Amino acid sequence: MTDNRVVITGLGAISGLGITADDFWDAMKSGRSAIQKLDLPIENIKISLGSTVPDFEPENFFSSDELSILDRYSQLAVIAAQEAVNDAGLICGENILSNAATIIGSGCGGKHTDEDTYLQLYKHNKTRAHPLTIPKGMPSAAASMVSMHLGIKGPAFGTASACASGSHAIIQGMTMIKSGITDTALVGASDAPFTYGLLKSWDALRVASDDTCRPFCNNRSGLVLGEGAGMMVLESAESAHQRGAKIYAELAGCGMTSDAGHITRPDIHGITNAMEKALHHANLYPDEIDYINAHGTGTLVNDATETEAINRVFGVYAKKLAVSSTKAMHGHALGASSALEIVATAQAIYHGIIPPTVNFTEADETCDLDYVPNVARKKDIRAALSLSLIH
């Protein structure tokens, strides 16, 4: 058993903000939101807003044979994963990549495949499903497809924990490197939730905004869904230094908890416990954190509870923290949100710029922190914390 330091050497992102990590970061710096009116051929849906990948033509990235086995969420995962590998300066076929782990989370998996299958069977009265329906739509499909496309032959599997799926994938990769199981891991998450069945289900939850996503504001009215994938290459610090790799940030520690309570209502004790565990694991004091990338969904309950949890953990220092939610820019991409937010946090540390909370008007009386309203802020960031919750 070892205790290797773990660093981020490659980033990939595809979202409503664009098809590359550079597009993603440019939007973060400028405070541009991708939330807009949905243009989908779907009737009887109350949800009218979303953040979808702009001008996305899968045929520009994949052959017709490849598309026959790739659900939309796997397509997004492969594109972002390829970018992260290229950004890290790794080459397919090299030992460092061939032996890497591939761990990719998802909150909902291949829902486009499921929906297409249901339409064929129940609307068009087909008598059989496509023979590749199962491998195309399974929750681990993205991990398998990324592994196959990049020739990665280390362990490949998925994680599923709702909005924290990406964080858990990244933590798993970090843990495997720290323990010496592998030197390199390609990790992240992908989700593509814009299907009739999922949108009707989100309608039923009654947490979606018909205005826009305004985290921590007194007139916030709910979340706005998004789609996308965030990927990163993790390496042991020794491996990265040996090959002269660019290092965005170090993953110093993590904290994971369960509320063991209500399935949708957050418990402040679980949130505070997770942050305290992360600080302890990273050997950091609260006053060494300069930035928190918040879960910040824009719902009444989440934002107030999250703010109170930060106040409890950081005490008087909480008012000196910069806290922002990037969901107001890229939307709530379910399991992919946590991965996209860790990509944003790594970029913030590397570039010394804190992404803003856009669409910000006036803070709620229960939300009393510095939420970096509307305009990005230059700041040397010693350490940052990314908070992903499951509600």
Task: Enumerate the language-model features and the residues they cover.
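Short pre-catalytic strand/loop immediately N-terminal to key active-site residues, enriched for Gly-Thr
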Residues: 129-134, 154-161, 217-221, 321-332, ...
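Phosphate/pyrophosphate-binding loops at sites that engage ATP/ADP/AMP, CoA/4′-phosphopantetheine
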Residues: 84-96, 240-244, 275-291, 313, ...
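Stable alpha-helical structural segments in soluble proteins, enriched in small hydrophobic residues
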Residues: 76-88, 169, 274-282, 309, ...
